[in-house]
Design a protein with these regions (language model features):
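Disulfide-stabilized cysteine-rich extracellular repeat microdomains
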Residues: 46, 170-171
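Conserved small/polar residues in nucleotide/adenosyl-binding loops
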Residues: 164-169
């Protein structure tokens, strides 16, 4: 599928002002090459913005990662590729699900990585882990990268609480 969508990017709060943003026209698509292989893409063109007064300069000695948002917003205001991610999905064992992905994973980083999810059938919980090798994208959000790269990962626990209520007004529980 593909679709054309309106898009609003924003930076809310800060010393430069309360709201900075841009209105964009975006193209989103998903190509399904096989039952378990997809390519997600998202690109957009800027229509109007108010980024001229946005500064938010950081003087931190730590690597500037998310604090570089101003550069990403300003240098990608005409055209940007937000995402272009090739993913493969697997079910290697019962109750075990996996995904591997590579590409431009989000507006600031691209890379390669994977996720595993253990979700027992008829249970309301799951346990997952993911690891990614990522590199910081160029500020214009096109095809280039900067020098900064790192490995990141997460462990996730999910619990779906289905509320049960009885006739007693104060009897509400998770089941």
């Amino acid at each position: 599928y593909w679709r054309i969508v309106p898009n609003l990017r924003s930076q809310i709060g800060g010393p430069d002002g309360f709201f900075f943003g841009d209105l964009r026209v975006g193209l989103k698509s998903e190509l399904i090459f096989a039952r378990n292989i997809t390519l997600l893409s998202s690109a957009s063109v800027g229509v109007v913005d108010n980024y001229d007064e946005l500064k938010l300069a950081s003087d931190s000695v730590l690597p500037h990662v998310r604090t570089e948002i101003v550069n990403y917003l300003k240098e990608s205001k005409k055209f940007s590729i937000e995402r272009m991610q090739l993913s493969a999905f697997y079910n290697p064992l019962p109750n075990l699900y996996a995904k591997t992905s590579a590409g431009y994973l989000e507006s600031m980083f691209g890379g390669i990585g994977g996720e595993m999810l253990y979700k027992p059938f008829y249970k309301n919980w799951s346990l997952g882990a993911e690891i990614w090798r990522v590199k910081q994208r160029e500020y214009n959000m096109r095809l280039g990268f900067q020098d900064y790269q790192t490995t990141t990962g997460f462990i996730n626990f999910n619990y779906l609480c289905l509320l049960y209520t009885s006739d007693a007004a104060d009897d509400v529980r998770c089941v």
